[in-house]
Design a protein with these regions (language model features):
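A short acidic, Gly/Pro-enriched loop at the edge of an enzyme's catalytic core
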Residues: 215-224
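C-terminal hydrophobic helical "lid"/dimerization subdomain
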Residues: 287-345
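Glycine-rich phosphate-binding loop and adjacent beta-alpha segment
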Residues: 232-298, 344-345
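Glycine-rich beta-strand-centered segment in the early N-terminal region that forms part
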Residues: 20-34, 47-93, 127, 132-134
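N-terminal Rossmann-like NAD(P) cofactor-binding module of classical short-chain dehydrogenase/reductase
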Residues: 81, 224-225
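NAD(P)H dinucleotide-binding glycine-rich loop of Rossmann-like/cofactor-binding domains
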Residues: 88-166
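Mid-domain Rossmann-like dinucleotide-binding core that forms the NAD(H)/NADP(H) cofactor-binding site
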Residues: 136-211
Length: 345
């Protein structure tokens, strides 16, 4: 089968690779679309992979073309996506409470094992999420990041709260859409790219340009959601959260941080709550994936407008380099990228 293979750091190749044997409780998925996650860029270009060679891709959808001998829950031709995290124990306290994303013994499609940037992928029955036929395939591959946005949202409880989103990438935009759909109105969003801010779902949401010094922000907020994940964004969050406020950290961090004693003391003096959020939940109650599917069905056109680039699997190699080097431009020669999806023929 055809696959985009990360041979080593900064070395991606389109190759013919052997298909893996289908295990008894797996389904062979013919991949329709794969989303490129922001984490895939450092994985490919900043020595972020756990092992090589690797087929990346953890945001995907497709059709079941073959069922393992003991795979009975789904059937051939079902349209599906998949929860990419594979808990290995199912016995720890996190797994018992259905917080599978907190399990320490896990694998992960597209990260710790091969993923969906290929023609086919064998997926465990446990990980399969069946999609409604009314979900457009171009949006089916975005289930995972939208579910992550819902995992962030569940921590924001007061509709009258003042909220600041730091970072207006795809998940930040989706979170703004969720807040808008739930009638939150006191929402400010900060990003350095005007074209991203232009996609906000509500004209009343305040747009903050990134080249404004973070610390020049005049307001203080009940909730700050840090989707940037650097020293400056964390320091800003500590300074700009009100007494008793909450900081939600939901970005992968790729460099060490030095946080001043003054800022650390703000956590104590202001009684701040800092919470880390990673991945999404598959709980029977409050399942982020069910929420994501319903959100897609109600907001198809807006979410489609967030897909800035679509490339074929055969031509997918160069898009990674262009994103990494910020060489995706509009006619005014401004960097213009939100979300890229890879299409299989």
């Amino acid at each position: 089968m055809l696959a985009l293979v990360l041979i080593k750091n900064r070395n991606l190749k389109i190759l013919r690779v052997n298909e893996k044997k289908l295990l008894k409780k797996q389904y062979k998925i013919k991949i329709a679309y794969t989303g490129i996650c922001a984490s895939d860029i450092p994985r490919a270009y900043s020595s972020g992979a756990y092992n090589y060679p690797l087929i990346m891709g953890h945001e995907f959808c497709g059709t079941i073309v073959k069922c393992g001998k003991e795979a009975k829950k789904y059937k051939k031709n079902d349209f599906v996506s998949a929860y990419p995290l594979i808990p290995k124990c199912k016995k720890c306290e996190s797994c018992k409470s259905e917080n599978f994303q907190l399990c320490k013994k896990y694998s992960y499609y597209g990260s710790r094992e091969d993923g969906s940037m290929s023609e086919y992928l064998n997926v465990n029955e446990w990980n399969i999420f069946k999609l409604k036929k009314s979900i457009p395939p171009r949006l089916g591959c975005l289930m995972e990041p939208i579910a992550v946005a819902f995992n962030i949202f569940k921590n924001i409880t007061n509709r009258d709260s003042k909220i600041l989103i730091l970072g207006c990438g795809f998940i930040g935009l989706i979170l703004s859409g969720i807040l808008n759909s739930k009638n939150f109105i006191n929402v400010d969003v900060l990003d350095k790219n005007v074209h991203k801010l232009s996609k906000l779902p509500n004209k009343k949401f305040v747009k903050l340009k990134y080249n404004l010094n973070f610390f020049d922000i005049k307001k203080k907020y009940n909730y700050i959601i840090d989707l940037i994940g650097n020293e400056k964004s964390l320091s800003t969050s500590l300074k700009k959260t009100i007494e008793g406020g909450k900081i939600l950290l939901a970005a992968n961090v790729y460099k060490d941080m030095n946080i001043s004693r003054e800022n650390i003391n703000l956590i104590l003096r202001k009684g701040l709550t800092i919470k880390g959020i990673w991945n999404s939940t598959l709980k029977r109650k409050g399942n982020n994936w069910n929420q994501a599917q319903e959100f897609i069905l109600k907001n198809k056109n807006w979410i489609l407008s967030l897909i800035s680039h679509t490339v074929s699997l055969e031509n997918s190699k160069n898009i990674f380099k262009n994103i990494f080097l910020r060489k995706i431009f509009n006619k005014n020669k401004n960097f213009e990228y939100i979300k890229c999806i890879i299409k299989n023929n």
